[in-house]
Regions:
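Conserved acidic donor-binding segment of nucleotide-sugar-dependent glycosyltransferases
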Residues: 153-154, 158-165, 174-179
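Nucleotide-activated donor-binding/catalytic signature segment of Leloir-type glycosyltransferases, i.e.
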Residues: 33, 62, 67-69, 76-103
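A short, active-site helix/loop in glycosyltransferases that binds the activated sugar's phosphate group
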Residues: 1-9, 19
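A short, well-ordered alpha-helix in the C-terminal region of glycosyltransferases
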Residues: 167, 174, 180-195
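Short hydrophobic beta-strand element within catalytic cores of glycosyltransferases
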Residues: 110-113, 131-142
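A conserved mid-protein helix/loop that constitutes part of the nucleotide-sugar donor-binding site
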Residues: 34, 42-57, 76
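Carbohydrate-associated surface elements
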Residues: 13-16
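C-terminal alpha-helical cap of glycosyltransferases
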Residues: 174, 198-221
Length: 221
């Protein structure tokens, strides 16, 4: 509607997650720390300063750790910000090979997703959300638009408004207070299986290609 495109000409085909995340080990209840993790590109659009501001608000939560895995244009700025604020419980890992990522996911009690408060960016659903769900992880976010819609529909976590550090901190406290956090992870995985699997993606894509008369080499689809 915003771009005067006929809705009948649009098909929603969300990204699926790599199969390597299907067997991520889940955290045991005996763990004494709460480990939150962001994994992915670290750029301006991701608004990770919101995470660091939330970490500052919650600095007295001594059992809380924030893990940031990835690289990007804002990484050095974030490291500097964390150092200036003396956020010793924020840990940066840099970029890691994709085949090592499941072991990092296994560390996390919940995954983080944040976006800048941009009305066009809010229309997107970052691929990390599907990956988080494939791994069976609860999600804590600070974003507007599609991300909170999915988190709410899946009943897999909590989401504050974009760039709202206080709201993100409150969402983290709600997660910590939830004695049934494991259920959030199970809900996350269940929603992934219902909406974001590779088979569903390929079947949907093939269906749409059939509608447009696409032909494979040597065969009609």
């Amino acid at each position: 509607q915003q771009h005067s495109v006929d809705a009948q000409k649009i098909e929603y085909l969300p990204q699926y997650a790599a199969a390597r995340f299907d067997e991520v080990e889940q955290i045991q209840n005996e763990k004494s720390t709460i480990d939150l993790m962001f994994a992915g590109n670290i750029g301006a659009a991701q608004s990770l300063e919101t995470v660091l501001k939330a970490a500052e608000i919650l600095r007295e939560e001594s059992n809380l750790r924030w893990h940031i895995v990835g690289d990007g244009s804002e990484l050095n700025n974030l490291k500097k910000m964390a150092e200036e604020k003396n956020l010793r419980n924020v840990i940066f890992y840099g970029r890691k090979p994709s085949d090592e990522m499941p072991q990092y996911y296994a560390m996390a009690d919940a995954m983080l997703v944040t976006l800048t408060a941009d009305r066009f960016i809010s229309l997107t659903l970052p691929g990390k959300v599907q990956t988080y769900m494939a791994a069976g992880k609860p999600i804590i976010g600070a974003a507007t638009g599609e991300i909170p819609n999915v988190i709410d529909a899946a009943k897999c976590g909590y989401c504050a408004n974009a760039e709202d550090a206080k709201g993100l901190a409150e969402a983290v406290l709600k997660f910590i207070a939830n004695e049934n956090r494991r259920q959030l992870g199970e809900n996350s995985r269940a929603y992934y299986e219902q909406h974001f699997t590779r088979d569903m993606f390929m079947n949907h894509l093939e269906k749409e290609l059939r509608c447009y008369g696409y032909k494979k080499e040597g065969a009609t689809v």
